[in-house]
């Protein structure tokens, strides 16, 4: 079974997205990853994956005790389902400024396990001024962060473990790359 976990962008969503023209011009609209200063390796297009359901976490960062870290292995695509994209909708001020975030300890634990990709169903693994430095820290350790995933509940309901297929656009000179992400159960 294949589950598309890519956010489908409608013309209305593109129009309504906060700062949409700037975001679209540099590849940050919808499901995408921030390029930082790295190239996406072709071997990352197919990764063993796992989706952790952390939808019950609220009012604090998502942290190491909230997941089964022992299930995370090197090279994996590790995604977090919070339900935020479904509850808030994509593109508004709250979506971009008050989204969940991963604790720095959890980010470091994932990087210590040499994950390839960290995926989230919200606007970034850290908020505000911590967003870009967190993405760069991941890039420096060989991991990419994919933002604005959707349909992760279906992956969780199908067991959570899967093969993730990630296909970024082959654009040059962009700070973000839109991508299509499919979970193969």
Model-based region annotation:
Residues 1-185:
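Active-/binding-site microenvironments in catalytic and ligand-binding cores
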